[in-house]
């Protein structure tokens, strides 16, 4: 679960508190809106797009976005810098140096340029997350193989890994997952893993 960090609490709940709502009064709807704004921002969402996502007026959506940037000015600077760097170099880059060409930034078509800006904002974030996940997958696979375990990694979905585990190996698999996923890379914030088990994927949710 990437919504939380040890010692930092629920990041989306804290964002909802920015509007002056005491922690105990933050509702699930407020948290959901904060989460939608957070993810929408890194995709370069417009006030129209956010208004559609949250079923609110365009004016309210614009106020959400404006308030977000006022509260987190560093995010605005990062996104603006990401676009400028991509315009200068012709590509966006992840934390690990992987490049994503963004030719749309030079398009004569306004819609294409807007798309390019959204890519330039999002690629360093989502691309870095993908890089980290791939490192974790390689490390988990190697460890399962090293221990000659019967359990196998069978699926990756966004920031989740699905393991088909032998009943006798469940605890050991959990230990491996936590270690390899939380230590895939050292960042200034911790990587936290939540795990669920079940006889099938549905039960594990």
What do the predicted segments below correspond to?
Residues 1-12:
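Single conserved hydrophobic/aromatic residue that forms the stacking wall/gate
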